[in-house]
């Protein structure tokens, strides 16, 4: 599709030849007009996902033409097309198992960003299919691009009991072997409007008869989805980022207990029981009940294994501060995201009893 478009409309894709973006920063060569471009083309795998759409928006604002590989129906990428000017966002149908379709999606690009990932298995794709085989396939076909960014996950380890963590670690390792000068991003737990973090725990506090508290003293460092996108854009704009590994996380560190207290305040579910439970109990419930009978289970055994550690940046790691990105405090977003899960009677309460 992309090749046909470029033949029929030579000006559709404007590739900047002989650019030096691999070592030098991405330069904004336009001066104010929205319709002017930098001459750069970026392919973003995972652009139709939760965090991908924010990155597409920022790249388009910068004047970069964005190729969006998709495998969904047209409705899945339609909202992305309005994030840029006419012809700036280019959807291309692809199959993650088909090398030819991947090559077609990156054939005109200076920049390739792999944000495609999966934290649960489906009937069509296993964790290894996406996080290992697809990651290495995309990297192998992108060896000649000028800038390659691979998005992994924080605390990924080949020795982890979590299949997700192991698959992410192996995918990252293979990518760095194929493209030694690629930039790796390891984001922490991500929150935002469509997340599976604040929304998930808010639903649990609303629908469950009790709130299970496990991993109570393990620490977390949540990251806002827009900060992840801003960090990736800053990597493109900052010199000397090639071949480096960045760990993206928020500035604030909480224990799971402190986070759940914030969820209870946000949802006003003060009457719910708070029951400390062991990891083994939660894994049993998840594996034998939720994953078997729930269509969209709130808890997955593998994710419980993955979160059974401190989800914080490691000492000495490069972070968003090194890219001059200011992070968003979770308190700024949590109330707005969780208030929809409050009980109806909460909105009938008298704000000031003296003025009945």
UniProtKB/Swiss-Prot annotation:
SUPFAM superfamilies reported for this sequence: NAD(P)-binding Rossmann-fold domains (SSF51735)
**Coiled coil feature spans:** none
Q: Choose one Gene Ontology CC annotation of this protein and give it.
A: respiratory chain complex I
Task: Give the co-factor note.
Answer: Binds 1 FAD per subunit.
Where does this polypeptide localize? Mitochondrion matrix
**MF annotations from Gene Ontology:** NADH dehydrogenase activity; protein-containing complex binding
The GO annotation for biological process reads:
ubiquinone biosynthetic process
State its role.
Accessory subunit of the mitochondrial membrane respiratory chain NADH dehydrogenase (Complex I), that is believed not to be involved in catalysis. Complex I functions in the transfer of electrons from NADH to the respiratory chain. The immediate electron acceptor for the enzyme is believed to be ubiquinone.
Task: Name the PANTHER family on file.
Answer: NADH DEHYDROGENASE [UBIQUINONE] 1 ALPHA SUBCOMPLEX SUBUNIT 9, MITOCHONDRIAL (PTHR12126:SF11), NADH-UBIQUINONE OXIDOREDUCTASE 39 KDA SUBUNIT-RELATED (PTHR12126)
Q: What is this protein called?
A: NADH dehydrogenase [ubiquinone] 1 alpha subcomplex subunit 9, mitochondrial
Species in which this protein is naturally found:
Dictyostelium discoideum (Social amoeba)
* Taxonomic placement: Eukaryota, Amoebozoa, Evosea, Eumycetozoa, Dictyostelia
